[in-house]
Amino acid sequence: MKVVATILYLVVLAICGLGIHGAHPTHSAPPTVYPSVSFNLTEANSNEYRHFLQELRGKVILGSHRAFDLPVLNPESKVSDSDRFVLVRLTNPSRKKVTLAIDVVTFYVVAFAQNDRSYFFSGSSEVQRENLFVDTTQEDLNFKGDYTSLEHQVGFGRVYIPLGPKSLAQSISSLSTYKSSAGDNKRLARSLLVVIQMVSEAARFRYIQLRIQASITDAKEFTPDLLMLSMENKWSSMSSEIQQAQPGGAFAQVVKLLDQRNHPIDVTNFRRLFQLTSVAVLLHGCPTVTKMPAYIIKMPVFNGGEDEERCSVVEEVTRRIGGRDGFCAEVKNGDEKDGTPVQLSSCGEQSNQQWTFSTDGTIQSLGKCLTTSSSVMIYNCKVVPPESTKWVVSIDGTITNPRSGLVLTAPKAAEGTLVSLEKNVHAARQGWIVGNVEPLVTFIVGYEQMCLETNPGNNDVSLGDCSVKSASKVDQKWALYGDGTIRVNNDRSLCVTSEGKSSNEPIIILKCLGWANQRWVFNTDGTISNPDSKLVMHVDQNDVPLRKIILSHPSGTSNQQWIASTHPA
């Protein structure tokens, strides 16, 4: 019996030894089943790609944190290990497959798996290694997953690396067949740069999503433009600025981007940033909670939990105020005397056009408060009743005096026009922008990646194939003004106008007159709405061949989705 017992003991010991030193790591608990999304390139079209990104955003975004109606990712402290990752399964036409792991805290690719092996970036965390691909052989890469490290491995920047369906298919093949023993880090890093931008970055920015959708539709590759690369690089800082912005969207710091020609773009407010980037998801930053009347603020600044970390409130922001027809609000003649009126004037850098927005609700220039009385003027803040110096700036550009409920209005579009207070009718003459007072020239891309256009021979607004050629017989470039108007860039006296305020009313081009039916808001859900009618621009489904544009109730359909794009692809 002793001999038998000894033999059994040795057998058990040998089995245990094999388990410890086997090819695969052992884990005491069963692997966590993370949610997943899939994208198959075999017969994919742009709509399937769009739905894939929508599904991915839905699984990555947890909770209800929002800033200016944009979803904010949860901080690491609020995410359990069992909810930490989302898996993205990619398949190409050659039936090669790879699975990416996305961290829901950063929306970034942290590892990938193929067959029975998985690969983690250098410096991977314990949470990643203990929860991802635990039933595979895990291997470490000898470089990190940030852009600097990946570009160093490739030997050049991602500005030279094409994106599109062909590049994605090749990258899936490269990742699915990668072996660390081969040591082809250059090819691996290049493939990772492609999938990171076509998955993570496209989910973060609808601007990037649109460019990739167009490349899928046209079966053409493209290289990232400098605006696209700069928004990728600045996602963290722009997320922070948005979450700490004042209620009207003014930033404390400038977000510095680049245009396609490498010219700097200084962005000082949320409205302009969204028009440029169509950012769809924000990285978590400590939130500032500001309570404002619901009837004034349409988009909440931040909705967070009670135990969220709080940012220090930005006490003051000094910016110009842009308004009707591109004029700026200024203290008349730069006169500092109490009672000096506020007027419209050509925008400049003079001190009497600089306005300081404070958290106490005051707006000051030349050391005096913007004050409501029989007219709009500046006055000693300590002399007049406090309620006459309080203002609320809405994200749609309305500036309201809460006591009276009246709003700043520019009765005429002319130099020297005195600013008045009037009942809010959501008119373009009542639209303002804090900072970024210069119009943004852009294409407006909508249904099936077609561009909003007008023909100089009539006043119709329709959709057409996007063209960057100056010889085109139609106008597809638009100037987005701070007063909320959308103007024909070749003739900025002409505005996009709804014929009425009811559903199915056509949208046309008329002379800019500061009307309510000439004011528009680019919303974070992708719609362009008219604040007065609360209806949105809609491609008439009954008239798609003619591509007629009408007003309609919001429905969430693709023919109500628009994006401002300085590059129409």
Swiss-Prot record:
Q: Which Gene3D superfamilies match?
A: 2.80.10.50, Ricin (A subunit), domain 1, Ricin (A Subunit), domain 2
Q: Pinpoint the residue ranges of every 1-alpha repeat in the record.
A: 325-365
Q: Which family does it belong to?
A: In the N-terminal section; belongs to the ribosome-inactivating protein family. Type 2 RIP subfamily.
Q: Where are the 2-beta repeats?
A: 492-530
Cystine pairs: 286-311, 328-347, 369-381, 451-466, 495-512
Keywords, alphabetical? Disulfide bond, Glycoprotein, Glycosidase, Hydrolase, Lectin, Plant defense, Protein synthesis inhibitor, Repeat, Signal, Toxin
Q: Which InterPro entries match?
A: Ribosome-inact_prot_sf, Ribosome_inactivat_1/2, Ribosome_inactivat_prot, Ribosome_inactivat_prot_CS, Ribosome_inactivat_prot_sub1, Ribosome_inactivat_prot_sub2, Ricin_B-like_lectins, Ricin_B_lectin
**What is the annotated role of this protein in its UniProt record?**
The A chain is responsible for inhibiting protein synthesis through the catalytic inactivation of 60S ribosomal subunits by removing adenine from position 4,324 of 28S rRNA. The B chain binds to cell receptors and probably facilitates the entry into the cell of the A chain; B chains are also responsible for cell agglutination (lectin activity). Agglutination is inhibited by Neu5Ac(alpha2,6)lactose, and N-linked glycoproteins such as fetuin and orosomucoid.
Q: What is the lineage of its organism?
A: Eukaryota, Viridiplantae, Streptophyta, Embryophyta, Tracheophyta
Q: What does the record say about domains?
A: The B chain is composed of two domains, each domain consists of 3 homologous subdomains (alpha, beta, gamma).
2-alpha repeat windows: 448-488
Q: Where are the 1-gamma repeats?
A: 404-436
Q: Where is the Ricin B-type lectin domain?
A: 315-435, 437-565
Where are the annotated 1-beta repeats, by residue? 366-401
Q: Which reaction does it catalyse?
A: Endohydrolysis of the N-glycosidic bond at one specific adenosine on the 28S rRNA
Q: Which residues form the active site?
A: 201
May I ask which residue range the UniProt record assigns to the signal sequence? 1-28
GO BP field:
defense response; negative regulation of translation
Q: Which organism is it from?
A: Sambucus nigra
Q: Where are the 2-gamma repeats?
A: 533-566
User: Which domain of life does the UniProt lineage start with?
Assistant: Eukaryota
**EC number of this enzyme:** 3.2.2.22
Q: Which SMART domains match?
A: RICIN
Protein name, as recorded: Ribosome-inactivating protein SNAI'
Q: What class of enzyme is it?
A: hydrolase
State which residues carry a glycan (glycosylated).
Answer: 40
